[in-house]
Every structure is written in structure tokens, then in C-alpha cells.
């Protein structure tokens, strides 16, 4: 096999496989590979205290989706999902910061489920005033781990739908396609999109 092809498809792991298969000591060929710890994320201070769990979940879902779009635009998949929740001063509670390692993905549905899983694992009660969602530990989007239990057809359909939605938002703006929850009082998608065109001040970095 061509080592350049393997490196393109599988990254450094593919190159190491080629060295191993051809009996080459890779330590004499290049320096050990060190992954750069870059990340993508959004954070926001809420306009009021969010007390209801469902309201906080709406915010987390929106942010998880927004960062997932940026992840796909960067051509990456994440292996680490993190959230941060800051409480109202009146709560006198320590903020929550938690993360989990996941199989490489940039699938919105999966990332939303991971973010909510982290939230449910740590949050019990209290008025939340700031929220952050971030993804890190990137690999190239061509990287895929398919197990015997994966529903490949379903994943491919989700990917095609995701691509179509991304394309529409790229052309007409993020708010051109929103879930029904965007009309609820707890939602921040529409309000944030109006701040300086929906860019960094609105927390929708890189999104129209």
C-alpha cells in the first residue's frame, strides 16, 4: 500500500501501520507525533436565571448543534465533549465543568445526546446563568469507526440530511432552519443571531 494514501485516510495511525507492516523502525524516521489540543466551543451569559431543567436543556441543545456545524465546516470530528454551567450568584454553588471521551463524531444528534448526558450526570438543581459547550481532541472527518452494531444505513441517511441542512444554513443563514423550541421563551437562537450578524458576540462564531 502507498504510505501517503494510508496517512491521508487514517492519519498518523495509518503511517505507523505501514511502517510496522514493512518492518521499519518509525522512531528513526520522524519525531513522535503530538496532537495539538485545539478546541471549538461557544459560551454565553444568559439574560436571566434559568431554573427549569427543560429550559437549560434547550440552551444546551442549541449550543451543541451550533458547535457541531462549525466542527463539520472545519472538516473535523471530536473525541472529547465538554460542558460548563455557571450558577447565579444567589445560589452560592460551585460551577459545573465536566467532559467525556467519545468515539470520533461530528453528528449533531450524537453530540446533543452526549451534551445532555453530561448535564444529567452532574446537574441536580439551581439557577443557571452561564453555559458553555466545547469539543476537542479532533481527528479528520474521514476517520470512521464502524462496529457490527452500527446501523450504517441510518447513519448515512442522517449524514445526508445533516449535509443538506448545513447547505441551506450556509446559503440563507443559521436561523433559516430552526426547531420548534426556538420559539419558546428559553431559546436564545434567534436573539443571539441578531447580535452583530450572529457572529462572535452572539456566540454563533462562523455561522451566518
For each of these PLM feature ranges, what is it?
Residues 1-126:
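DNA-contacting surface of Y-family translesion DNA polymerases
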Residues 97, 101-208:
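Acidic, metal-coordinating catalytic segment for phosphate/diphosphate chemistry
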Amino acid at each position: 500500500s502507498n504510505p501517503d494514501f494510508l496517512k491521508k485516510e487514517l492519519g498518523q495511525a495509518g503511517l505507523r501501520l505501514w511502517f510496522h507492516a514493512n518492518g521499519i523502525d518509525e522512531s528513526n524516521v520522524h519525531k513522535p507525533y503530538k496532537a495539538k489540543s485545539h478546541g471549538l466551543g461557544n459560551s454565553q451569559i444568559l439574560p436571566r436565571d434559568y431554573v427549569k431543567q427543560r429550559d437549560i436543556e434547550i440552551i444546551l441543545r442549541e449550543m451543541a448543534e451550533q458547535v457541531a456545524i462549525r466542527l463539520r465546516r472545519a472538516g473535523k470530528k471530536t473525541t472529547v465533549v465538554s460542558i460548563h454551567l455557571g450558577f447565579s450568584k444567589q445560589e452560592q454553588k460551585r460551577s459545573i465543568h465536566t467532559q467525556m471521551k467519545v468515539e470520533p463524531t461530528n453528528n449533531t444528534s450524537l453530540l446533543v445526546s452526549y451534551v445532555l448526558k453530561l448535564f444529567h450526570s452532574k446537574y441536580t438543581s439551581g439557577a443557571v446563568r452561564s453555559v458553555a459547550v466545547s469539543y476537542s481532541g479532533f481527528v479528520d472527518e474521514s476517520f470512521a469507526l464502524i462496529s457490527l452494531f452500527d446501523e450504517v444505513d441510518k447513519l448515512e441517511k442522517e449524514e445526508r440530511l445533516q449535509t443538506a441542512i448545513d447547505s441551506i444554513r450556509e446559503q440563507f443563514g443559521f436561523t433559516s432552519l430552526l426547531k420548534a423550541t426556538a420559539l419558546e421563551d428559553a431559546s436564545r437562537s434567534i436573539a443571539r443571531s441578531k447580535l452583530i450578524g450572529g457572529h462572535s458576540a452572539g456566540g454563533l462564531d462562523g455561522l451566518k
